[in-house]
UniProtKB/Swiss-Prot annotation:
Protein name per its UniProtKB record: Histone acetyltransferase HAC12
Biased composition (Polar residues): 397-406, 794-805
Molecular-function annotations in GO: histone acetyltransferase activity; zinc ion binding
Localization of this protein: Nucleus
Pfam families cross-referenced by the UniProt entry: HAT_KAT11, PHD, zf-TAZ, ZZ
Keyword Metal-binding: yes
Gene: HAC12
Region of interest (Disordered), residue spans: 1-33, 251-284, 397-456, 524-543, 791-909
Length: 1706
């Protein structure tokens, strides 16, 4: 017998093309299947190999029967088609596109070859284009398989006696009808492997039969993409003659049928009808059912059967996923009639009627018979045991295109299909022994086959009637496959055959449990089975039931998704016989009621609440498919554990069952709901309420169980998780395709109405037998040790192939095969596995925590937003995410996922706003996700790279942004001693932790010669230092949805980890949220639920800036409309802007010591009080208020001494480039520039109105790699150079000058270092305004230090600012005469400082808000301003005017001129006498200093490099602003003296220190307190956020700081100040603690945090609070290092600029 190889669209790594494989079986005419004219019929791909055939026996010769001329001809045609496709493309194709075109060309050529009648037709180039067009439209290719429909019906033909049974006539051999263009994802079409007859001996089993009948070949066809396609008995129709009088069957070529013929047909049954509907495109059913049918079986005499196999795999049109990869959506359903001849082993036939059955090891199949005419919905799955699996174990994943149908199973050496007799006998004996052992089990599970017409249910344990025969098992080899006989339909036309359109249906692959459990199954009633399996088509009246055959149809489109079928155990089926009358009656009923067939609607709720078999899990099937290696042992099948599993699931069902009572089909549901209600309020550990005590114990165990091998908890958790994953995956896939057709589902209520209930048994009971521990893939951020059983090695190969959700149009026009992907997944069951049903939330990774995140193995092909599969760029909606749409009759969401009531009853804190998307409308959510995939802020190359990842999403990818791994920008590290930044990938040393961590660069480490190193005055042993490399990468954290169990990046989900309440907060992903909102199951939260920018306190300053900004924006919009000539309403405007002052605190600036030493005699102030303010601009972008702009200012008021009196310093200003709309204003500048300028002008106007006289701006861009305020800027935003930045400021000042806000603009050098014109002011450093963080104060310290070293005779610093020191002679030459003491130092300082500043003097901008006196240069605020009538720039104050009048005429204005100008007074009015701020103090620990905010952002990775991150970072910044964190001291219970957790205690409203824990409060007689006790506020209570609550928290923080100061000064042992003793106790703890904060001591960390808060706000130079001085010195050092780096960068920039100027001039 021979094997035909039909390959199409082969890809690398798949089964090679196989040529004809001859075998010496006594029939020489069968040695060659392909003749000279028909060789190509065996080759559908032009590149088919010729010498790689595989037969049953490896010793047979391999002969290539391919005609090379035909192959070359076909290759030439492929090239023509390929060139034609390329010419149609507008742009040159890349390598990937060429590969796609070549694949399309290959399939088009195949269609052309099949269509061609003659060689001339095939080669005709004039008609080539029209033929290709018709092929693309899908008519010829789609109907190619129907060419058999007009051929003679083989079902009504019998062999012609006397004719030689040869297949030598090529015209009678039909190539595989699985067409790649129809299948869409066909990787391998029908590769028929001739398995031959294992028993080649003569007689009954060998060679040709003596009666002249052909010994039927057994064809095993491998389906496309790894699926098994059509498989049946081959018989040359040339030897068949029509049988008169028989009704012709309607053949469904795309149905999943089964056809089996006996090897020896008794003469009495020669005329028996053998209808064949195992069409060539039977992707699953006929293949799997045909596989393994033993050739040595005799037909049963009985002519009537009750198990007609449905030609359309029992698929109801409403259930079939017409968008799936194997569905022809344009076709209607096709009925097919079958004649199934069941077999039983010949050595078991003893003349009496024996129930026929067969067992197939390796591949296990079983048939379920709900109805004699509905046909068998079959499911095929691996039944191999551990000893049947080689090292490359196959792992079934219960889905179409899963590992069972993957081609790798069949890429075995030829000897994999061969069995030695001794092995076969051993396996037979082992099988029987195991069957006997199983019979001893107390519970015999059987599957009852019911004909659906009220016939007697027949129990059958068919294993007792089976004797394992050759070919049954493959020990340590791949499953041996034997095919039933299949008819190769010829191309002859037959008037009796009716053609019908086909509808393909996916079949689900279900693994079968190991051999030891092969007999077990659960009882099921007929109504269940009918609901599980609703075949639409009608089988013939002559069919038998098959044992060990089960096929479940998988409907992707319906919400329930999976057909309930036994996925773990080999289900045994009885042979229920019915009469022809009943068959005909049911036939009529089915025809008339076809459209009323009830489709299965299995949801998560119905699985639990009804007596169904289990839904199919993704990965728990692996446990049985690979044997005991990854199983938890037989203990999981203990009835005790099974009952506990059932009870847990039924509890979960009752908890979420809706409505609460009365309508649930299970009578026990209401009872369990009452039990839940009782347990919610029951606190009695010995409660006598029925089931209460034991249920609470079981739930308690379930909550706390961490055992990865627990036989109760792990299966339940696995089932719950995977049910939710599949539910949401189906919902995502439903609407993700370009267009879905024929998607109609029936609600769960209709299913419940027809479902039978088992009285007294929870309906979830039947699901538990299938629950096995599943794979839980751990998502690793850094490194971790996987949690796996010590004695098990559970590494398996999960082979999954993706599904395409094609629309009708996509299926016709582009059928791109999908690559199968093999992933190595290590079985690791984490301790923190999901416990979704009873209030246990999986721990989510927080910042700073490198915790592995479990992420479920999602269903292949259901990744991401559009349910798109890998390698499907052609049908992917790249820009618009797909969304699950509510179909008519779609079950409610709470039936698929956990209801909010469940989570709240299970004590999950219902914290509102844990994700900001909860405030969004569905459209805003969609807009947000669209924005995620735009990658705004990244460079074009990176953005395109990330966008390309959408087309290859995997289960590792984020479901929102479609990218898998995203890492943060590493925060900069600075050396503690020298302040230098440690470069990326450089080595360094570190010690300590948290705020006390110190870093040492290699040079500083090497400079310290001893065994210790000095850091901030503390000596540290070098032995404790840890050497590291600055190459750490931190991955973005993930969060898991509590409903669908899907994972997203926290940033993508706008998830607030601070609200997570220890990982227990309920989180709903955007997908589930949108579904809930659109189904009216929830409403978006009010905007007030999460406080935003508008909820921040308003101040006079913020109102002033906002009002001015909005007014000017209206004017600008009007101007734009005028310029563009359009109406005002048509002009885009700026929306949703919010300006707020987030910090306004009093500070003191201490004068540096060396500078103060010079001017101490002049009574120079030792410190300058000022107010530090932070102004932020927010704009709502895609529903999120994003911080776009910020500035720090220092206000030195009228109470401050000179030279800082009434001055303002613009300390830092920063922005990010996300402003919307990104357009130009009327004057040509960017609209965002207009807005930022108006904010600055508004602030200057506000300062002028308050009485400030000047503003100082240092136009200094940030260093490369560093930031001022907002951490990590986008790549698209270039850092401006100093000249560009300076011009930006000057443009703003020119606008302000036009409005009269700015009186004069100059620079620091011209105003203070020169005496030009009539200026009479002294040039001294004492006149320079002294600002915190400015350039010159730090530079002055360096210069003074250098001068001191010169005076001491020491060598100056080589890196000094000046190469040549300035001598007194030089000063004398310049006109300076006073060289005494400090005056000399002052002059030298001004000279050196002037030389330093002069090259960049334009960057130090002095803005005069009031007029300055020409003589003394003071800014006038009172009295009169004396103005010259002729000189506009000359004006004097009252004091200088009086002095001017006393001078001689030649010294008066104008100096040295005879004509004197008239000077007249102008009264100075409207300037306040003081600059007192009427705004309240606003404290913010995070915005206290620029460095504090930057550290917050760096430590928590609040980056602004992309809009995606900027939205999340701004959300978190607003959270911190609204929730100032008051330190939480440990509260002690006054009764039991144990610590009270936050929010879990009671406090007296009168007594300050009386607190009681919950346990003591509930105990009777424990509390004897006269005052009222109130509960502690918890995180859940923070939902009701309001401004009063925020003010209260601010007040608490202030009280805490006051308490710290009080405790540090208090000496009373019995102080009555609340919590004073506790703070003192912390002080004492800090003295004796050896662990310290750096070692992780909780108390020390709290104390350290409190001390830092105090030190930042402390203004006392001599403070009694411990470590206050040290902390302030630490902060000063950090600021000094930052200023030094800034100055050094400026000097380097100036040096480069000077070099450039010198180069150009030279």
């Amino acid at each position: 017998m021979n094997v035909q190889a039909h390959m199409s669209g082969q890809r690398s790594g798949q089964v090679p093309n196989q040529g004809t494989v001859p075998q010496n079986n006594g029939n020489s005419q069968m040695q060659n299947l392909v003749g000279s004219n028909g060789a190509a019929t065996a080759v559908t791909g032009a590149g088919a190999a010729t010498g790689s055939g595989t037969g049953v026996r490896p010793s047979r010769n391999i002969v290539g029967a391919m005609d090379h001329d035909i192959m070359k001809l076909r290759q030439y045609m492929q090239t023509l088609v390929f060139n034609m496709l390329q010419q149609r493309q507008p742009s040159p194709a890349d390598a990937a596109s060429k590969a796609k075109y070549m694949d399309v060309a290959r399939r088009l050529e195949e269609g052309l070859f099949k269509m061609a009648v003659t060689k001339e037709d095939y080669m005709n180039r004039s008609t080539l284009e029209s033929r290709i067009t018709s092929l693309i439209k899908g008519r010829q290719i789609n109907n190619y398989n129907q060419r058999h429909a007009n051929s003679s019906s083989v079902g009504t033909m019998i062999p012609t006696p006397g004719l030689s049974q040869t297949a030598g006539n090529p015209n009678l051999m039909v190539t595989s009808s699985v067409d790649a263009t129809i299948v869409g994802n066909t990787n391998i079409t029908s590769t028929a492997l001739n398995t031959g007859n294992p028993l080649i001996a003569g007689g009954m089993h060998g060679g040709n039969m003596s009666n002249g009948y052909q010994h039927s070949s057994r064809n095993f066809s491998l389906g496309s993409g790894g699926s098994m396609t059509s498989m049946g008995a081959q018989r040359s129709t040339a030897q068949m003659i029509p049988t008169p009088g028989f009704v012709n069957s309607v053949t469904n070529n795309n149905s999943g049928g089964f056809s089996a013929e006996p090897t020896i047909v008794p003469q009495s049954q020669q005329q028996q009808q053998r209808q064949h509907t195992g069409g060539q495109n039977s992707h699953m059913l006929s293949n799997h059912m045909a596989a393994g049918v033993r050739p040595d079986m005799q037909s049963k005499p009985s002519g009537a059967a009750n198990s007609s196999v449905n030609g359309d795999v029992g698929a109801n049109e409403k259930i079939v996923d017409s968008g799936s990869s194997y569905t022809n959506a344009s076709k209607k359903l096709q009925q097919g009639n079958f004649s199934l001849l069941s077999f039983c082993p010949d050595d078991l036939i003893s003349g009496q009627h024996i129930e026929s059955t067969f067992h197939i090891s390796g591949e296990g199949y079983s048939t379920t018979n709900p109805d004699p005419f509905d046909g068998a919905i079959t499911s095929a799955g691996t039944g191999t045991k551990a000893h049947n699996i080689n090292t490359a174990s196959f792992q079934p994943v219960s889905r179409v295109n899963s590992s069972l149908s993957h081609q790798q199973q069949f890429q075995q050496p030829p000897n994999r299909f061969q069995q030695q007799p001794n092995q076969i006998q051993q396996q037979q004996q082992q099988f029987l022994n195991q069957r006997k052992l199983k019979q001893q089990t107390p519970q015999q599970h059987r599957l009852i086959s019911n004909d659906g017409l009220g016939k007697t249910q027949v129990d059958s344990d068919m294993v007792t009637k089976v004797k394992c025969e050759p070919g049954m098992e493959n020990k340590s080899q791949a499953p041996q496959s034997q095919a039933s006989e299949r008819f190769q339909l010829s191309q002859l036309q037959n008037q009796y055959q009716n053609s019908g359109e086909d509808c393909q249906a996916d079949a689900q692959l279900l693994p079968v449990e190991s051999q030891s459990d092969i007999c077990t199954s659960l009882p099921q009633n007929s109504q269940q089975i009918q609901q599980m399996m609703h075949p639409q088509n009608i089988g013939s009246d002559s069919s038998n039931s098959f044992s060990n055959l089960a096929v479940g149809v998988k409907s992707e489109s319906s919400p329930q998704g999976q057909w309930p079928s036994k996925s773990q155990e080999n289900t045994l089926m009885s042979n229920a016989i019915s009469s022809g009358k009943h068959i005909q009656e049911d036939f009529r009923q089915r025809i008339t009621g076809m459209d009323e067939a009830q489709p299965n609607n299995l949801t998560e709720g119905s699985v639990i609440g009804q007596n169904h078999t289990s839904t199919i899990s993704e990965s728990h099937n692996l446990q049985n498919s690979i044997g005991t290696t990854c199983r938890y042992g037989n203990v999981s099948h203990d009835p005790k554990f099974k009952n506990q599993q059932r009870w847990l699931l039924f509890l979960r069902h009752a908890r979420s069952c809706k409505p609460p009572g009365g309508r649930c089909q299970d009578q026990n549901c209401v009872t369990v709901q009452k039990l839940w209600s009782h347990m919610d309020n029951c606190a009695d550990p010995q409660c006598l309420y029925p089931r209460c005590r034991h249920t609470k114990a079981l739930i308690g165990h379930y909550k706390n169980c961490k055992d990865p091998r627990c036989p109760v908890c792990v299966p339940v958790k696995t089932y719950q998780q995977q049910a939710n994953v599949r539910a949401l995956a189906r919902l995502k896939n439903e609407s993700s395709a370009v267009g879905s057709v024929n998607r109609s589902v029936v609600s769960n209520d209709s299913l419940s109405a027809n479902a039978g209930a088992v009285s007294g048994t929870p309906r979830c009971a039947d699901t538990l037998d299938n629950l096995q521990p599943s794979l839980k893939r751990l998502k690793v951020e850094q490194s971790f040790q996987p949690v796996v059983p010590k004695t098990e090695s559970c590494k398996s190969s999960i082979v999954s192939t993706t599904e395409a959700d094609l629309s009708q149009d996509a299926e016709r026009k582009d059928h791109r095969p999908l690559k199968s992907e093999t992933m190595e997944v290590k079985v690791e069951i984490p301790d923190n596995s999901v416990q979704a049903g009873f209030g246990i939330k999986e721990t989510k990774s927080e910042p700073f925590e490198n915790v592995p995140k479990p992420k479920p193995v999602s269903e292949p092909g259901k990744h991401g937003l559009s349910g798109d599969s890998p390698k499907q760029e052609n049908i992917k909606m790249k820009k618009e995410p797909g969304w699950p749409k509510k179909e008519p009759g779609c079950p409610k969401k709470e039936e698929l996922v956990e209801s909010p009531e469940l989570t709240s009853k299970s004590r999950k804190p219902k914290i509102k706003g844990v994700s900001l998307t909860e405030l969004f409308t569905p459209e805003q959510v969609r807009e947000h996700i669209r924005g995620l995939r735009q990658w705004v802020g990244q460079s074009k190359a990176k953005a395109e790279k990330n966008q390309a990842m959408e087309n290859s999403m995997s289960e590792n990818s984020c479901q929102l942004c479609a990218v898998e791994k995203l890492t943060f920008e590493p925060p900069p590290i600075y050396c503690t001693p020298c302040g230098a930044r440690i470069k990326r990938n450089a080595m360094y040393y570190t010690v300590g932790g948290g705020e006390t961590r110190h870093y040492f660069c290699i040079p500083c480490y090497n400079e310290s010669r001893g065994d210790t190193i000095l850091a901030e005055g503390t000596s540290m042993p070098k032995a404790k230092l840890e050497k590291k490399k600055n190459d750490e990468e931190i991955e973005e954290s993930w969060v898991q949805c509590d409903k669908c169990q899907a994972w997203q990046h926290q940033i993508c989900a706008l998830f607030n980890g601070r609200r997570n309440d220890g990982g227990q907060a309920e989180y709903t992903c955007p997908y589930c949220y949108v579904i809930d909102v659109e189904q009216n199951e929830r409403k978006p939260l009010l905007q007030s639920a999460v406080l935003g920018a508008k909820d921040l306190p308003r101040t006079i300053l913020s109102d002033h800036i906002e009002q001015r900004l909005f007014k000017r924006l209206k004017q600008e919009r009007t101007e734009r409309a005028r310029v563009q000539g359009t109406s005002y309403d048509e002009i885009p405007t700026v929306e949703s802007l919010v300006v707020r002052v987030v910090s306004s605190v009093d500070k003191k600036l201490e004068v540096k010591s060396r500078f103060l030493e010079i001017f101490r005699e002049d009574n120079f102030p030792t410190e300058f009080p000022y107010k530090s303010k932070v102004v932020l601009l927010f704009q709502k972008i895609e529903g999120v208020e994003v911080c776009l702009f910020g500035m720090y200012v220092q206000e030195f008021g009228s109470e401050c001494s000179n030279p800082n009196q009434r001055r303002v310093y613009l300390s830092y200003l920063d922005s990010v480039k996300y402003f919307r709309p990104d357009i130009k204003s009327a004057n040509g500048e960017a609209l965002r520039t207009f807005v930022y300028h108006e904010i600055l002008i508004g602030y200057l106007e506000y300062c002028k109105l308050r009485g400030f006289t000047s503003c100082y701006i240092w136009a200094c861009p940030p260093l490369k790699g560093e930031d001022y305020i907002l951490y990590c800027h986008p790549e698209i935003q270039k850092t401006p150079k100093s000249d560009k930045l300076r011009e930006w400021y000057l443009a703003m000042l020119r606008k302000a000058a036009k409005e009269g806000i700015v009186a004069e603009t100059t620079n620091l050098y011209d105003h203070f270092f020169l005496q030009t014109g009539e200026c009479r002011a002294k040039v001294t450093a004492a006149r320079l305004p002294y600002f915190d963080g400015d350039y010159w104060p730090g530079a002055a310290e360096d210069i003074i230090s250098q001068m001191s070293q010169e005076d001491d005779g020491r060598k100056g610093n080589k890196k000094g600012i000046l190469k040549k020191p300035i001598t007194k002679r030089a000063l004398k030459a310049s006109g300076q005469s006073d060289f005494s003491g400090n005056a000399s130092k002052d002059l030298l300082l001004m000279h050196k400082l002037g030389e330093t500043i002069h090259p960049m003097k334009e960057d130090f901008i002095m803005v005069h808000l009031q007029h300055s006196c020409t003589h003394c240069c003071t800014l006038m605020v009172t009295g009169n301003r004396w103005v010259c009538s002729q000189c506009k720039d000359f004006q004097l104050c009252d004091g200088c005017y009086e002095a001017e009048q006393k001078r001689e005429d030649r010294e008066r204005h104008p100096v040295n001129q005879k004509d004197k100008h008239n000077i007249f007074p102008v009264e100075i009015a409207d300037i306040p006498t003081d600059t007192k701020d009427r705004d309240e103090i606003l404290e913010s620990e995070f915005f206290d200093t620029r460095q504090a905010f930057l550290s917050l952002c760096q430590g928590n990775h609040y980056q602004y490099d992309t809009l995606r991150r900027a939205k999340h970072s701004s959300m978190m910044v607003l959270y911190h602003l609204h929730n100032p964190t008051a330190p939480a001291f440990v509260t002690t219970c006054n009764v039991c003296h144990l610590d009270i957790e936050s929010g879990l205690g009671w406090r007296c409203e009168v007594c300050p220190d009386y607190d009681v824990c919950n346990a003591c409060y509930k105990k009777e007689g424990c509390i004897n307190h006269p005052h009222k006790l109130t509960t502690h506020p918890s995180l859940a209570d923070q939902n009701a956020q309001n401004k009063e609550a925020r003010q209260l928290r601010v007040l608490q923080l202030r009280k805490m700081l006051d308490l710290l100061v009080h405790a540090s000064q208090c000496r009373s042992p019995v102080c009555l100040y609340p919590n004073c003793r506790k703070v003192k106790g912390l002080f004492r703890h800090g003295l004796r603690c050896k662990v310290r904060a750096s070692g992780g001591c909780v108390l020390c960390k709290k104390m350290w945090y409190l001390l830092q808060l105090h030190a930042r706000a402390c203004k006392e130079s001599e403070c009694d609070v411990p470590r206050c001085g040290d902390l302030k010195e630490h902060l000063r050092r950090l600021q000094q290092q930052s200023d030094s780096r800034r100055r050094a960068a400026v000097m380097e920039m100036m040096r480069q600029r000077a070099a450039e100027v010198a180069g150009t001039s030279g």
